[in-house]
Design a protein with these regions (language model features):
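Conserved phosphate-binding/catalytic region of the ribokinase-like
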Residues: 1-10, 169, 193-195, 199-311
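Glycine-rich phosphate/adenosyl-contacting loop at the front of the ribokinase-like
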Residues: 1-64, 71-75, 248-249
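Short beta-strand scaffold segments in enzyme catalytic cores
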Residues: 52, 98-102, 110-111, 223, ...
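Conserved phosphate-binding/catalytic loop of the ribokinase/pfkB sugar-kinase fold
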Residues: 66, 88-91, 101-138, 143
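A glycine-rich helix N-cap at a beta->alpha junction
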Residues: 79-93
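Short gly/ser/thr-rich secondary-structure transition/capping motifs
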Residues: 82-83, 119-124, 160-167, 241-242
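A short, aliphatic-rich alpha-helical micro-motif
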Residues: 130-134, 175-176, 215
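Conserved beta-alpha-beta core of the PfkB/ribokinase-like small-molecule kinase fold
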Residues: 137-208, 228-230
Length: 311
């Protein structure tokens, strides 16, 4: 690990889940019952996914969140415990957050999230971990914890990255504190509307959506485009980054891998544009394997990706 990586620290304030994954030929329609294929219980949650991805990118990572005292908590923390500091994770007398993930034969996924313990990661919980949060170079949040918890993390983080997935009702000042705001094209349109935009159909034109969000006061914006890569804009300028073409096996967790890799690069002091040229390669590596956290490249594999980016 380089001196720069050793000094870099990411704190993720967010969700920790156990994912019930079920393979299906296709997604059921309304009122339809389908037979599922193989079912597995694996660690997940957007916050946990992003924390693991950042740690695999070679920086120090700590997690602030909550799990239950039920057996699925051990599953939820199983991979994080290998490389992420869990001193900020509280066990509560409530169920561990759970996601029910349907993965179609096409590789696409559909997800239902049950917040459970994640719903307790509020402003009081974040204040209780104030020293931990304030020690980070980059603090990362997502939309799977209460909005007041996100706001508290934003106020305490020296560098704040928020991935509004899903988009929840958060004070507009908190959105404008993000540097960057990371969203997909559909989330970009929803966030723009929340900030007062009246421009229609922004989800159909990510470039327009990006400039709209910047015009509404966002410091910097990254819009992820799935297999097409991402676009980024802010004070440094604008860029469009293509993702390598691969045959997707499972897209679950790819967006979280992107956010984690980007956070790690920013914590190292890389510019946003440079981070956005690296993160899509990490995300692309995940879709070639099944699972979310299970598909994330190891630290050694990330270094191979990094060398390829600089070749």
């Amino acid at each position: 690990m380089s001196d720069q990586s050793a000094a870099a620290k990411v704190v993720v304030v967010g969700s920790i889940n156990a994912d019930m994954r079920v393979g299906v030929e296709r997604f059921p329609g309304p009122g339809e019952t389908l037979a599922g294929g193989k079912a597995t219980l694996t660690p997940g949650g957007k916050g946990a996914n992003q924390a693991l991805a950042a740690a695999r990118c070679g920086v120090r990572v700590e997690m602030v969140g909550a799990v239950g005292k039920d057996p699925t908590a051990d599953t939820a923390l199983s991979l994080l415990s290998e490389c992420v500091g869990l001193g900020g994770v509280v066990r509560r007398d409530i169920l561990t957050g759970t996601a029910i993930v349907m993965v179609a034969d096409s590789g696409e996924n559909s997800i239902i999230v049950i917040s459970a313990a994640n719903g307790t990661v509020d402003s009081a919980s974040v204040r209780a971990q104030a020293e931990r949060v304030e020690s980070a170079n980059i603090v990362v949040c997502q939309g799977e914890i209460p909005s007041d918890g996100i706001a508290e993390a934003a106020r305490r983080g020296s560098g704040f990255v928020v991935n509004f997935a899903p988009v929840i009702d958060v004070d507009s000042d908190v959105i404008r504190m993000a540097d960057p705001l990371v969203v997909n094209e559909h989330e970009a349109a929803l966030v723009a509307a929340a900030l007062g935009s009246t421009t229609p159909h922004l989800e159909d034109d990510p470039d327009v959506a990006l400039r709209e969000l910047l015009g509404l006061g966002c410091r910097s914006v990254v819009i992820t485009l799935g297999s097409a890569g991402c676009i980024v804009g802010g004070p440094e300028g604008f860029d469009s980054v293509a993702a390598a073409r691969v045959e997707a096996v499972d897209t679950v967790g790819a967006g979280d891998a992107f956010v984690g890799a980007l956070a790690a690069e920013l914590a190292r002091g890389r510019t946003l544009l440079k981070g956005c040229r690296f993160a899509p390669a990490v995300a692309t590596a995940t879709v070639t394997k099944p699972g979310a956290q299970a598909s994330y490249p190891s630290t050694a594999e990330v270094e191979d990706i990094r060398r390829g980016e600089h070749a």
